[in-house]
Amino acid sequence: MAKLEAQQKDDLQEKLIAVNRVSKVVKGGRIFSFTALTVVGDGNGKVGYGYGKAREVPAAIQKAMEKARRNMVTVELNAGTLHHPVKGRHTGSRVYMQPASQGTGIIAGGAMRAVLEVAGVHNVLSKAYGSTNPINIVRATVDALVHMKSPSQIAAKRGLNVDEIRG
């Protein structure tokens, strides 16, 4: 019960993406365990994902949530959308995301939608190519978000101010 209260104090949104039963074959038969994939975010640019494995489903989910909280990254957003189109990839999965106008919503499938929701993105157009394995899609999505640069970051890198870059 104490863990539950701590989760509410953090004010983080948590989403369970996938639970999977896996087996290990041993001499005496099969040993079943469960894996869980979760994402956690504050709805304001911080997002993390976690993958947990245990003999019982609740324990796997709890492990995944803890790992997600430990692996959070910060993403700079532009009023609920992205600054520019971005691509991300992880193994066989590739994702493409582009900013969308107000009122568009999150046009994304499954695992990518969950990541974008908890990150605080409200308007985005996206597409997943290649493998749609949830773990790879989540990692590719986070990769794309991390590599997105804000105009202020680009201006600082070039030694200019934001108005000069925007033209």
UniProtKB/Swiss-Prot annotation:
The keyword rRNA-binding applies. Residues 12-75 form the S5 DRBM domain. GO terms for molecular function: rRNA binding; structural constituent of ribosome. Pfam families: Ribosomal_S5 (PF00333), Ribosomal_S5_C (PF03719). Keywords: Ribonucleoprotein, Ribosomal protein, RNA-binding, rRNA-binding. GO terms for biological process: translation. It comes from the Bacteria. One of its GO terms (cellular component) is cytosolic small ribosomal subunit. HAMAP family: Ribosomal_uS5_B. Part of the 30S ribosomal subunit. Contacts proteins S4 and S8. With S4 and S12 plays an important role in translational accuracy. Located at the back of the 30S subunit body where it stabilizes the conformation of the head with respect to the body. PANTHER family: MITOCHONDRIAL RIBOSOMAL PROTEIN S5 (PTHR48277:SF1). The N-terminal domain interacts with the head of the 30S subunit; the C-terminal domain interacts with the body and contacts protein S4. The interaction surface between S4 and S5 is involved in control of translational fidelity. Belongs to the universal ribosomal protein uS5 family. This is Small ribosomal subunit protein uS5. It comes from Shewanella oneidensis (strain ATCC 700550 / JCM 31522 / CIP 106686 / LMG 19005 / NCIMB 14063 / MR-1).
